[in-house]
Amino acid sequence: YNSYMHGRQYYYGLSLGAAYKFSDNFSAFAGVRGVYASTNYYGYVEDIKVGNMPLYKVLDPTKETAANIELSCDQSGVGFTPIIGVDFKTGKWNFAAKYEFKTRIRLKNKSVNQVPSIGNLPDNLRNAYIAGGVPEAAANAIIGNPDIQGAMGQLKTEFDTKLEKAIGEYEDGKKIAGDIPAYLALGVGYSPVDAVRVNVGFHWFDDKHATSYNNRQEKLKRGTLEYNAGVEVDVNKKITLSTGWQNTNYGLPDENLDTPASKRYMDDKSFVVSSNSVAVGGVYHINKKMDLNVAYFHTFYQHKKTSEMVQLSAEKSINYSSDYTRNNNVFAVGLDINF
């Protein structure tokens, strides 16, 4: 078969909050962020074959696209995120913490999808027998055999189940859970001299309790952990340089040959892999009100390998292995304007 899929996800946020300075050293913040989510997915699977036979010849021999699967789905939804934070400064040290509560979002589907059906399989097989020279009465007897009827019923059930698993998430009119997980950030900053600033941080995303389609999050071992470190140096009054590192570690389950389907998290539509990122950046201070920022970072993604046994028939099965990874390079340019 031939397959293709692409997608985009845009999450627009508008935050409103207030901070209060309790003393020269301690301040606190509380606020809320409104989130509007807009996503789009398009993909297809074509030229599906069973063995060497095109599947459409079984489903509808008169239509070559009868077995094709095509997905075109827009999703949108709204959510709200309460946020709290604290900051404490003493001497050359700065300590800060922020917690963002879970954002409940339900994405509404608007879809124009094409999916195959095997409801006409008995009639198509009957017609194929007759076209091949089998008498009509004999063809009717074959198709009407209880064992044949039972096998085709079982095949239809399995076909519909697998199809629902593949694209049921994008069915037109359906509302899909797409929560943004709760998020804890801890940071420590230290400035040994005025021109040098060193920062380290820790992030925790509570992915395991952020509801997703079919409660997929329950398959995770834990939420995502991130560790960060960075250094910023004022070279002179005009130029500031910086570098940083981040480690991202997802709580992915093991997926070996004996892992049941109900415990498998990774799939071809959506996957994540742990990574390390390194970055460099610079600021050119144009004047007191304008700064030009440039940055580059590269992410080194790990490989997540999975294996499963696919049962082709009662007597035959194959071992199917996947290797998930990706690549990422980001360049950024920005202009800060202080009014």
Predicted regions and their residues:
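Outer-membrane beta-barrel porins/channels
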Residues: 1-339
